[in-house]
Each structure stands twice: as structure tokens, then as C-alpha cells.
Amino acid sequence: MSKIENHEGFKRTFKNHKLTLGLSIPFDSKNKEHIDFNEQVKFAQQAERLGFTSLFVRDNPLYSPHLGSVTENYDPFVFLTYLSAFTSKIALGTSSIVATLRHPIHLAKSSASLDLISNQRLLLGMATGDRSFEFPAFKVDESALTERYQTTIQSLRALWQSHSPNISNSIFELYEDSGLQVLPKHHTIPMFGTGYSRQSMSWLQQHMDGWLFYAQPFQDQKKLVEAWHSGTDRFKPFMNILMIDLSQNPNETVKPIKGGFRTGRKNLLQILKAYESINTNHIILRFTNDDRDIEALIEEVGTYITPHFPAHTI
């Protein structure tokens, strides 16, 4: 068994040929201008109580008015640390950290600290970034993103292994007897490629602990999942984000929307079972409803859907 498979968050969330469910947070509502921290915590605790396996937050360092109305976006490490204080079992994930815009030392220390504080519940989705206005703000050469992403991932592995690693690369050098004072319990934290992150699939299969992708038409996803699992040397989970506009009518038929579906809970269950049948291992649901309360959505899915996809016993 690898060190990753000993990680508590990984063990509860992932198992070959089994599916578990998570939620995208912070929640937002078109009916309310702002959902405060106390309500976010209430929803997180409700999700944990009802058997959801994870909560995933986004990382967008900058906002631009050209993006239009977007969900409030807190610093992912600060927000997840806050949530960790009010939850005990649910995995805490990022979807995803823009790895190319953060210094590896800061990133290694923040993630190690959160993983320890949360009792090894952190799942790190790692992205290259796709907002062109962010790269000049951080003085990052967009043409070098492929190499910078690889260097960051390799640097994190080294920084988590030892208190005094010897590292020399294009981003930083660490020659003296120095390193992180606090290391993760397992000397590693699960990291997941996001999309292709400007890499080949083979690089992701070799260097990442799993793959976080975007919802695809079913047959396309089936081919992608098969290609992913067939090229890894051990079980490395495949997961995706799925947009859901959940009807109050449990029998409503399926209507495709961007990144997911509008449907009732009965067809949603069948959709998720189909994803499980092709060895999708985790799905992060993101509610898009503008006609229902968040609490009611979590309650309905948690009552009728999550019991079919329970967290794995540690």
C-alpha cells in the first residue's frame, strides 16, 4: 500500500469501481446577495451529517468585472481551515489550486498545515490556470506554464519528504540545512491533475495521485476513464465536477445544461450509477438552482442519493 492510500481523506473518498459524492462550496444563491460564514458552516455540517464525502473549494486569485457575477471566492486554505474546525470526517478539497501562481514553499507549508489541522483530510486539486489576466499580475510567463507546473509538483513532493531537502530548479534553490518545520503525517498529500494542466495524460498518470476532470458526454467520459485507469501503475481515482439543476419534481426527465443536467432526483440517481459503472470514483456536485434553497437541495440529495454512494470505511 502506498503512502497516499494511508491518507485518511483519500481512504474515505476513493475506492476502485466505487463512486462517492462531494459538494462544491462556498454555496451561493441567486435569491440572496450574500451567504455568510455561519450559513456556509451550517451547510457543510449538514453535508457531513448526510453522508457526503467531500467539500471542494475553488481558487481564483483575482477577479475581473469581465467575468460577470461570480461566487464569492475566499482564499482556499483559509476557508478550508475554517470549515475543518466545524467538521470532523468530510474530506476537504481544492478544485483547484492554481499551482503556477504560488511559490512552492508557501504552497507546501499551507497545505501541510491544513492537512495536519484537519487530521489528514486535504485533497489537493492542482491546476495550471486559465485566466490570462492573472499571469502578468504574478510576473509568470504564460509560455512556461507546462514546465512551471511540473516543477511545482515535484518541489512539493520533495518539501514534504524531509526537513532539509536539497532542491535546485527554475523557481527556487534550497541548499542550506533548511526546510519545512511541519511535515504532513504521511510525508505526502494527495494531488490531482485538473484537466490536462498543459501536460500529457502519461505525465499526469505518472506524477499525480488522480485526475480531476470536467463533465463530459457519457461516451466521451467512458473512453477517458478507461484510458486513465489503463495507464496507471496503481489505483489512481478519476473524479469530475457535475453541474446539477435539481427539479422539485423527483420524476423530471433529463435536460442537458452546461457542465451537467437539469433533472429530478430519480434520474440523477441513474446518471450517477452509470458514471460509477465506468469507474468514475468521485463526483463533486455543484448546484445551479435559482428556484430552491441550498438546505433543501442538500437534504434531498443527502436523503435519497448519497446512501447509494457511501464514504468508505477507514
Regions flagged by a language model, labelled:
Residues 34-47, 110, 193-203, 261-275:
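Short, acidic/polar
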Residues 25-37, 97-105, 187-196, 252-266:
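Active-site mouth loops of central-metabolism enzymes
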Residues 21-25, 55-57, 92-94, 122-126, ...:
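Hydrophobic faces of well-ordered beta-strands that scaffold small-molecule active sites
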Residues 1-17, 143-187, 214-314:
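An alpha-helical appendage that flanks or caps ligand/catalytic pockets
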Residues 41-58, 205-214, 274-281:
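Catalytic domains of carbohydrate-active enzymes, especially glycoside hydrolases
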Residues 1-86, 189, 288-291, 300, ...:
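N-terminal beta1-alpha1-beta2 module of alpha/beta enzyme domains
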Residues 51, 59, 83, 114, ...:
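Conserved, mostly hydrophobic/aromatic
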Residues 16-35, 99-167, 290-291:
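Flexible, glycine-rich active-site loops centered on histidine and acidic residues
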